[in-house]
From Swiss-Prot:
<feature type="region of interest" description="Disordered">
    <location>
        <begin position="200"/>
        <end position="220"/>
    </location>
</feature>
<keyword id="KW-0749">Sporulation</keyword>
<dbReference type="InterPro" id="IPR038491">
    <property type="entry name" value="Velvet_dom_sf"/>
</dbReference>
<keyword id="KW-0539">Nucleus</keyword>
<dbReference type="GO" id="GO:0030435">
    <property type="term" value="P:sporulation resulting in formation of a cellular spore"/>
</dbReference>
<feature type="compositionally biased region" description="Low complexity">
    <location>
        <begin position="361"/>
        <end position="375"/>
    </location>
</feature>
<keyword id="KW-0805">Transcription regulation</keyword>
<comment type="subunit">
    <text>Component of the heterotrimeric velvet complex composed of laeA, veA and velB; VeA acting as a bridging protein between laeA and velB.</text>
</comment>
<feature type="compositionally biased region" description="Low complexity">
    <location>
        <begin position="272"/>
        <end position="283"/>
    </location>
</feature>
<protein>
    <recommendedName>
        <fullName>Velvet complex subunit B</fullName>
    </recommendedName>
</protein>
<comment type="similarity">
    <text>Belongs to the velvet family. VelB subfamily.</text>
</comment>
<dbReference type="GO" id="GO:0005634">
    <property type="term" value="C:nucleus"/>
</dbReference>
<dbReference type="GO" id="GO:0005737">
    <property type="term" value="C:cytoplasm"/>
</dbReference>
<feature type="region of interest" description="Disordered">
    <location>
        <begin position="341"/>
        <end position="396"/>
    </location>
</feature>
<feature type="domain" description="Velvet">
    <location>
        <begin position="1"/>
        <end position="173"/>
    </location>
</feature>
<dbReference type="InterPro" id="IPR037525">
    <property type="entry name" value="Velvet_dom"/>
</dbReference>
<keyword id="KW-0804">Transcription</keyword>
Length: 441
């Protein structure tokens, strides 16, 4: 390199800077300046300068029209920040030819205005301990914007991407980025909405007043309607998952129980006395149990009962149809003299001191084990809500039996030790059926 003089080097700015943002947020000059070093082929036919590690290029900020300006009148040295010096890179050009390039990927300007970049090439000569100026060049003018007016960084150029793929540290951007400022003009906002296909609800006029929270009344009404629609959708999805009810069908929710109480181990007794395998209540016999014909009132009450939470069954209802361990109702059976009653009847509540007469024949009015009379509630053609008189359906399957199996007077069964009736193996209390009250003492 000792044979190469000052006139043998030539600098060419391959990528000119276009604009920059004031360096409050350290925005780099876009695109990054790239300078190519070219040497006279006759002086260096072997292109040995590409491997010279002592060639450096510096960047300095100057005014728009000044190429040789005075340091006192020009920009300060502190106005240009970042990496101001670049070493030589041996890279492949876009035409796949080898060349020497200086890349400035981290340059920022701290003052708003229009400037140029002055590039000066130096060679360090360690033997002589000197630094020789070999060449210089100046870039095209570029504008430094304030933060509010900065148009944003553009997409990376093909030359920048090519050098980045070869190992040079450069910031790549796939698409153009616009600055999102709070004081954007109305025209810019409308252009963005039009490009994205969005039609805002906020009218853009000079007389449009905003509420204190930043929303217009029209926008607030729109938000309110969207909120109501969301609640309606949630309600529809909730009821679509609930069991559907048809007029004439009675489920657990129509009697005030929760809709999923039927899935628990202790199931509630069906009011119609149907078998567990039957999904619907039996409709045999005349009268039909007094189903309600007004579907509007029925569904309004079912909706109220569905949201009112689970309720307990009255004690009188438990005495009508006792429950077994499986959770289903047991049809009333006549009492048999001398035999212990089933276990569900042992837990029957005592309504009064009235007892069964001794040796009552099966089917007699006095031998019935239930105090419920279907004739008292089946006379009305409309159903009353639970909790009122006659508010429970009658069992239509036993309508043909008439009054033979029911009594109008409440009865109770006295408790006796099982040993007193010839059951020494029993370990609990037995029930004596058909015994007089005096026999218990």
């Amino acid at each position: 390199m000792s044979t190469l003089g000052q006139g043998d080097f030539e600098l060419a700015v391959r990528q000119q800077p276009k604009y920059a943002c004031v360096a409050i947020e350290r925005k780099p000059i876009d695109p990054p300046p790239i300078v190519q070093l070219m040497v006279n082929p006759r002086k260096d036919p072997g292109r040995t300068f590409l491997q010279n590690p002592y060639l450096i290029l510096t960047a300095r900020l100057i005014r728009k029209g000044d190429e040789d300006q005075d340091e006192q009148t020009g920009p300060k040295e502190s106005d240009l920040t970042g990496t101001l010096v670049s070493s030589l890179y041996s890279l492949k050009d876009t035409d796949n030819s080898q060349g020497g390039f200086f890349v400035f990927g981290d340059l920022s300007v701290r003052r708003v205005g229009t400037y140029r970049l002055a590039f000066i090439l130096y060679e360090l000569r360690l033997a002589e301990k000197e630094c020789w100026l070999l060449s210089r060049t100046v870039s095209d003018p570029f504008v430094v914007y304030a933060t509010k007016t900065f148009p944003g960084l553009a997409e990376s150029t093909f030359l920048t991407r090519s050098f980045s793929d070869q190992g040079v540290r450069l910031r790549l951007r796939k698409d153009s980025r616009t600055v999102s400022t709070k004081k954007r003009t109305i025209s810019q906002a409308d252009q963005i909405r039009a490009s994205q296909g969005i039609h805002g609800y906020l009218p853009h006029d000079a007389n449009h007043d905003l509420s204190p929270n930043g929303h217009s009344p029209h926008h607030l009404r729109r938000l309110s309607s969207l909120h109501d629609q969301a609640q309606l959708d949630r309600s529809r999805s909730y009821y679509s998952e609930s069991p559907q009810m048809r007029p004439g069908e009675y489920t657990s929710s129509s009697y005030g129980y929760a809709p999923y109480d039927d899935q628990k181990p202790h199931k509630r007794a069906r009011m119609d006395g149907a078998s567990p395998d039957s999904p619907h209540p039996s409709s045999a016999g005349g009268g039909g149990g007094g189903y309600e014909t007004d579907t509007t009132a029925y569904h309004s009450y079912a909706h109220h009962a569905h949201h009112s939470g689970p309720r307990t069954v009255p004690d009188a209802l438990g005495s009508i149809y006792p429950l077994t361990t499986s959770g289903y109702a047991v049809a009333p059976q006549p009492a048999l003299t001398g035999l212990p009653m089933p276990s569900p009847y042992a837990s029957m509540p005592r309504l009064d001191t009235t007892h069964l007469p001794p040796h009552s024949p099966a089917g007699a009015p006095g031998s019935a084990s239930s105090a419920f009379s279907p004739g008292t509630i089946g006379s009305s053609s409309r159903r009353s809500p639970p909790g009122t008189a006659g508010g429970y359906p009658s069992y239509a399957g036993h309508a043909h039996a008439g009054q033979a199996m029911f009594t109008s007077q409440p009865t109770s069964l006295p408790y006796h030790p099982a040993v007193a009736h010839g059951h020494p193996g029993a370990g609990g209390l037995g029930i004596a059926v058909g015994l007089d009250l005096d026999e218990r003492h």
